[in-house]
Amino acid sequence: MKTICLYFQVHQPMRLKRYRFFNIGNDHYYYDDYLNESIMHKVANKCYLPANKLLLQLIKEYGTNFKVTFSISGIAMDQFRLYAPEVLDSFKKLAETGCVEFLAETYSHSLVAFKNDEEFRKQVELHTDRIKEFLNVEPKVFRGTELIYSDEIGAKVFDMGFPIVVTEGAKHIMGWKSSNFLYCNAINPKQKVLLRNYELSDDLAFRFSNQSWAEYPLTAEKYVGWISEALENGETANLFLDYETFGEHQSKESGIFDFLKHFPKEVLKKTSFKFATPSEIAEKLQPVSAVSVPHPISWADEERDLTAWLGNDLQEDAFNKLYSLTERIQKCEDKKILIDWKYLQSSDHFYYMSTKVFSDGEVHSYFNPFDSPYDAYINYMNILSDFIIRLNSAVPENQKDQELATLAAIIFDKNKQIEKYEAEILKLKKGPLKTTSSKATKKTVTTKPPSKTVAKKAPAKAKTSKTVQPKTATKKKTTAKKAAATKKAKTK
């Protein structure tokens, strides 16, 4: 039996807001809510909702003959709950059909597998729990962030209970081998490995609407013909895509939804191929050999390695600084700090710091909120500096940090008390002041004439009496003399 495996990745990071140096220590909220919500609504309306609706219609039409596979990051599910719960509901409807498989990955869509095994396990377990909670299914297959994989990572996830992984069929690891077969892990042969056919996958993901492409336009009929050629000497065609291919990276006007609508019909009508999930393929096929991947691979960029996230000094510095906090994070019980820890681990933050150019640079610009890799680095490190201050308070690193944390707690409590007392003082001032002012006004109106006039005029009256008395005596003497002179004149 020859199969086609359609797998779609769904992920949106919590994008960070512009965080300045002067915000450090003062602002502990790091996310651009407006940008995150607007992008989620945009992608939901252009991709997730119409694509899910179409897939549900196809499953109803073709039943178990049409099957697809998804991986949805934990951070994406968080944002669905916040901004677009209808998207989560549409995925639930797909899960209920029994024709859709959901894969496990790290909750944060992170690169933690390269730093700490315990944290890696916790994130995978948390993601698995979320899938069970929201979609009522239990993942049996693992996919690394951006299909990152190595022999060592494969062996680790096998021990976690995942006997099947999916990854990239990179040229430098395949050599003469074909990605159209099932393989096994080089360290643990019990683990089965499905490899992405990157040529057929990229025809849809990147070249579908490219009018300068020699094969443009790509029809469902032509594409099925290419799959038939690939499976002449193969057993499975693994078509792994970013789900935003439908409606976002390739617009509705490009005809991508019409392509998806007619694709199952062309396959089922003109070939004997079966659509299958990774679990079904691993159950029905046997590995042809081991695939050796001593160094990590991914599906990103031309190199198919980790350079998209860890390819320059900026990325390495930020990455190492973040994971140097792991041991203390594991001792932390502050819920807000732990939530930020999950969101700050998203691989996208390091992806935005990439200095790659040309064709890969165009891909790196998708939903990138920063003007340059250096802006992304500075912004992230400012946030990380504030995060470390908070972590030092919650989980001191040494005796000095312990003392500082204690003092910081005391200062915090004192500031709270001061704010309380200042509020009480202000309240007291506002109350009595109004009453006093009213009484004073009333008193002034009724008592001003008698009290203030008498008090101020009394000295003046005393002074006036002293000066008037001599004048009165002189006037009397003058009058007496005139009277005597008049009498004397009459006598004569």
What are these regions (language model features)?
Residues 3-8, 14-116, 140-143, 163-168, ...:
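Short, well-structured secondary-structure segments
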Residues 52-56, 88-92, 121-131, 154, ...:
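Generic structural signal for well-ordered alpha-helices
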Residues 87-104, 121, 125, 137, ...:
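Acidic, His- and aromatic-enriched active-site or binding-groove loops in soluble protein domains
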Residues 119-146, 226-240:
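CE4/NodB-like, metal-dependent polysaccharide N-deacetylase domain
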Residues 430-492:
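Intrinsically disordered, polybasic Lys/Arg-rich low-complexity tracts
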